[in-house]
A protein has these predicted regions:
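Thiol/disulfide oxidoreductase modules built on the thioredoxin-like
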Residues: 108-111, 118-158
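Thiolate-centered catalytic microenvironments shared by cysteine-dependent enzyme domains
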Residues: 163-168, 233-265
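Short active-site neighborhood of thiol/selenol oxidoreductases, capturing the structured segment around
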Residues: 50-70, 76, 192-193
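Structural microenvironment flanking redox-active thiols in thiol-disulfide oxidoreductases
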Residues: 70-109
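Hydrophobic membrane-insertion alpha-helices, especially the h-region
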Residues: 7-23
């Protein structure tokens, strides 16, 4: 009996800690974190940069030692390709003044950014890398993101710049129709409903397992296989996007978001 009570206590503590991890993960990536100095509507000053040279500048704060910077390289390449087609936008890479040979690092990542500066991150209010900020011609930060972005945030960033995201949706999402087809053909797909237990108990798909978002960091490592295809479901797209980031950080490489079927065009 004592061992059983101890095991239950350990599980409850693990779930509590996982909830704290989710909240920490989410708020660290929020541009409105009061502890994060650089935020939207703040003016940014970098020596040698005249913001008025472009209507908008996409600033990337990077580090050669940052694994999430390297893992975001494919997105940065798509971003650079879209910006290169516009005359009123540019990209600017900023590295810490303590680093060197950042240009060689960008070539290694195959991210074509010509404007490169070294600066004190603390003086700019940048506490985490990678950081992406959209800066207007007056040097005012209009939007910013921190960390490796999940698919919907990548699309949101591109949309705010008026750019089309060329990444195939098939790489990160699956439609209802395609999911039904995979299940009908008995393909190995694990559908995870990340809503809370009450919502799941009220109504859920027969084939879905319930792992609430606040339990995901702990339970995913213990209950899911890195080799399986995982489909995430929730009524809130921002929650599935966050869940995608959590699983990606833990090494899951076959993660898809369940999205509605496309609406056929009206005649």
């Amino acid at each position: 009996m004592t061992i059983r009570i101890l095991n239950i206590a350990i599980v409850l503590v693990a779930l509590l800690l996982s909830g704290l991890l989710v909240r920490k993960f989410f708020f660290q990536r929020s541009a409105q974190n009061p502890n994060y100095q650089l935020a939207a509507n703040e003016k940014l000053r970098i020596n040698g940069i005249n913001w008025a040279d472009s209507d908008r500048t996409v600033l990337l704060a990077l580090s050669k030692e940052c694994k999430y910077c390297a893992r975001s390289a494919e997105f940065y390449r798509r971003l650079a390709a879209g910006i290169a087609k516009r005359n009123n936008m540019r990209m600017l890479a900023v590295f810490s003044e303590k680093e060197s040979e950042a240009d060689a690092y960008l070539r290694q990542l195959e991210v074509p950014i010509r404007d490169l500066r070294y600066a004190s991150f603390s003086s700019l209010g940048i506490k985490s890398v990678p950081t992406v900020a959209i800066v207007d011609r007056n040097g005012v930060v209009t939007y910013m993101w921190v960390g490796k972005l999940p698919p919907l945030e990548e699309k949101d960033l591109m949309s705010k710049l008026g750019l089309e995201d060329t990444r195939s949706p098939d790489e990160w999402s699956i439609t209802e129709a395609n999911l039904r087809a995979k299940l009908a053909h008995k393909e190995q797909v694990t559908l995870i409903d990340i809503r809370d237990r009450t919502a799941y108990a009220t109504n859920h798909r027969d084939e879905a397992r319930n792992i609430p978002l606040d339990e995901l960091p702990v339970r995913a490592q213990n209950e899911l296989s890195l080799d399986e295809t995982i489909v995430l479901y929730s009524n809130d797209p921002s929650e599935t996007d966050l869940a995608y980031s959590i699983l990606e950080t833990q090494g899951f490489t076959h993660v898809l978001l369940l999205v509605p079927d496309a609406t056929p065009p009206s005649e």
